[in-house]
Each structure stands twice: as C-alpha cells, then as structure tokens.
Amino acid sequence: MTSTKVDEAKAALERGEFDAAFRLSEQAQAEEPEDPAARELYAVIHLARAIRLSDHAREARRQDLLRREIDYDEEFQDSPEVARAYDEAAAAIDDVLRVAPDHWKTRMLKAALVFRRDRESGRPQALEILQALAAADPTNKQIPFTIRKIERPCDRCGDTGFCPHCKGRGQRRFLRMDRKCEQCYGRGICPACGVL
C-alpha cells in the first residue's frame, strides 16, 4: 500500500502538483514510517517546502526593513510577522529532521537559518551543527566552506549579513528611481558572506 502512495506522490511531482505530492508523502510516511522510499520522499518534498519558507522569511525581513525604513547600521528587532515567518521555516526544518535526522542538506539549512535569524546568538549553534556534519562526512567540501563563512565576521558588510551596496534593501536609488541592486541581484544579502 505504501509503495502505491510513494508512486502516487512521485507521479504528482512529475505533473507539478506539489500540494498533492506533499499530502501523499505525509500519508505514505504515516502508514509505513520505516519504509526508506517513503522516508526519503517525505524528506525531499518537505525540504523543498522548508527552503521556500526559509527564503520567504528572508524576503519578509527585507520587505520589513524597507517598510519600516530601518537604517543600515541601526539595531532592530524583527516584527511579529517576520518572527513568525522564521518560526514557520524552523518548524518545517525540524519536521524533516524528525523523519530523517541525518539528512545533511536539511541540517545545513537549519544551520543557515539559525545563523541568518540572529548572527550573534546563532553563530555558535550553527557552527556546532556544521562541525557535526563535517565530522560525519569529511569528503563534503561544501561544509568547510560554509563553516569558514560563519566562523569569521564578514569585513565587507560589518557582519550584518546585508548587502553593503544597497544597505540590505535589494534596490538602489539613482536619480529618484529605484533599481534592483546589481551586486546582490535584488536579494539584499551580502554577496561575500550570504549563507545559502
């Protein structure tokens, strides 16, 4: 029965029906939690959702900075909407880790989200996650690269994580016209230390 749900979920993905695949992967995982195919499909589909939510949280922060007109070097607290977006992304990541605790891409995303949410308090937790990943898979070259990005405060952006060219807004004003920042491609994150 489970393999049928897995096959249905894969077919839904092929048709581009993400919501149906999401629901079917949950059903397959609930029916047979030890089935490796169901577990892997659940992890992959839910990881895609977690990536979307993580990107949405970053974009919500950028839009909030624009709306509140917060200056580049000014300390700020996230608005409740931004905090909720980060909480949803963290919950989605934890959901994947509940089913596949050794999924390295999900653990990388968790480290990036923890660090991105608050660089000061998130740095030690992110480094702990990444160092455990590096110990588990020393051949993965992406992990040491990410560790180096997180270990050292970025000189380019003053360790804010925001693009120094557009001040984290994703757009620059020239002759009273807003244009997408060419350095960060409108994302508002530092091109040197932006994680994931």
Model-derived features: where do they sit?
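"A position-specific structural signal for the A-helix of alpha-solenoid helical repeats
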Residues: 7, 41, 48, 109, ...
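Conserved structural position within tetratricopeptide repeats
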Residues: 29-30, 91-98, 132-135
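Short coil/linker segments at helix-helix boundaries
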Residues: 48-95, 116-125
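Cys/His-coordinated zinc-binding microdomains
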Residues: 155-158, 167-170, 182-185, 194-196
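Short functional micro-motifs and their immediate structural scaffolds
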Residues: 159-162, 171-174, 189
